[in-house]
């Protein structure tokens, strides 16, 4: 029988009142906070760790995936493009020269508009970027629960070294990655157990030597991926090798399994010319819980959406299918002043997987932050935001709202689960990332 205790009521100090409050300092939260601040409202960002960037930094997924469609057409502009360049401002990179000046198009056979980046350099650059944009960032502070008045969030309770405190705001953006605010505030959500995945950086003497000789430090210190991926076959015992990132038990199981993979790999590679030099310090869940919004993105959506806040792509496909994401995928009818941003926006099936990529997370963050600022200025709810006003601001800032004729021919790739032909341990990504699938299974086409 589950036990409960009653906690005595006590007064909680209000330490901040602001216009827009963002929960989560990943790429979506950064974009949301900066976009809102650029519209002239006061913004506070609450981050549970001590670095910005989320999975891109503390999760070691330091690959800014393509923002072009693979046919030479830039799909993501605005902050999605800006943040790519912020991440490499002080870092080595492998950005193709053809894209360095931020053109809208390039030759169709050009390399993809993407780059790897150095994590510490990106962290420091993101600190500088948010400070320059006037965002008040509060580190080492964990969102606990919302303060509700009907269907309106009036504030949030935060736990930190100062104890339990309250932050009050007019508009809230949930960029937690796990829909923590929208779930605890009573909105509908969907959860998904996802595969165990583990990225880390390593030093291998031969690889390092080649990288140094070529003047390529990113190649000298490559990433490695280990994972447990279910085959999808009937009766496969690997089907239970997934974890729920919304529970304490699920998170701890994920950590146990992922570090177990790393330990097994380390035991098999104990030699003088090899060293594991960094481990992620946040669980590397792909998807956990997402908003069930007023509308959603589906994988087979290939049509014009009047309320589009920007285009998104299945980044690893070449050519990549281009989709339009609806404003209604950021909101729910059940909450009057809360937006979702990042991997937890309203998208189903493979559409949800598309929305977890860094560029898509930044896009939804920029849209949510801009919309929140509009709502503050106009004194309206999230449902009453003037979509045309939002779209004009986004478009003026470089966001591609709708597919162009050149993008319409890109067709979806058929995704399936399969056993790879290569043996476990074979490098199958590129010279910057090597992939080892301990169990010998992978998702075809999903090499990230």
Model region roles, listed by residue range:
Residues 36:
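Aromatic pocket-lining residues of Rossmann-like dinucleotide-binding sites
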């Amino acid at each position: 029988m589950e036990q409960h205790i009653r906690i005595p009521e006590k007064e909680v100090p209000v330490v901040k009142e602001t216009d827009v409050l963002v929960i989560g300092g990943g790429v979506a939260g950064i974009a949301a906070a900066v976009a809102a601040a650029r519209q002239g409202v006061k913004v506070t960002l609450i981050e549970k760790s001590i670095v910005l960037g989320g999975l891109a930094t503390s999760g070691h997924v330091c690959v800014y995936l393509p923002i072009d469609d693979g046919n030479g057409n830039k799909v993501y502009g605005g902050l999605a493009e800006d943040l790519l360049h912020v991440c490499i401002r002080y870092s080595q990179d492998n950005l193709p020269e053809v894209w360095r000046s931020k053109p809208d198009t390039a030759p169709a056979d050009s390399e993809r508009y993407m780059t790897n980046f150095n994590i510490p350099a990106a962290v420091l650059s993101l600190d500088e970027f948010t400070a320059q944009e006037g965002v008040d960032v509060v580190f080492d502070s964990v969102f606990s629960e919302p303060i509700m008045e009907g269907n309106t969030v009036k504030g949030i309770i935060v736990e930190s070294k100062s104890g339990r405190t309250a932050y009050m705001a007019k508009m809230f953006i949930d960029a937690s990655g796990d829909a923590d605010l929208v779930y605890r505030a009573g909105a509908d959500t969907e959860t998904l157990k996802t595969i165990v995945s583990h990225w880390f950086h390593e030093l291998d003497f031969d690889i390092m030597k080649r990288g140094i000789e070529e003047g390529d430090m990113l190649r000298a210190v490559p990433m490695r991926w280990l994972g447990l991926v279910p085959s999808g076959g009937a009766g496969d015992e690997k089907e239970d090798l997934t974890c729920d990132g919304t529970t304490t038990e699920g998170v701890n199981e994920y950590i146990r399994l992922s570090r177990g993979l790393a330990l097994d790999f380390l035991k098999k590679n104990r030699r003088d010319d090899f060293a594991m030099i960094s481990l992620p310090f946040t669980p590397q869940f792909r998807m956990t819980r997402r908003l069930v919004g007023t509308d959603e993105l589906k994988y087979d959506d290939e049509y014009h959406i009047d309320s589009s806040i920007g285009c998104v792509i299945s980044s690893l496909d070449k050519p990549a299918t281009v989709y339009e994401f609806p404003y209604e995928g950021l909101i729910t009818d059940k909450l009057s002043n809360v937006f979702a941003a990042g991997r937890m926006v309203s998208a189903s099936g493979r559409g949800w997987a598309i929305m977890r990529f860094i560029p898509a997370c930044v896009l939804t963050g920029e849209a949510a932050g801009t919309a929140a600022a509009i709502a503050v200025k106009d004194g309206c709810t999230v449902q009453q935001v003037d979509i045309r006003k939002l779209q004009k601001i986004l478009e003026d800032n470089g966001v591609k709202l709708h597919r162009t004729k050149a993008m319409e021919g890109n067709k979806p790739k058929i995704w399936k689960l399969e056993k790879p032909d290569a043996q476990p341990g074979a490098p199958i990504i590129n010279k910057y990332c090597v992939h080892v699938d301990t169990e010998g299974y992978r998702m075809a086409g999903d090499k990230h």
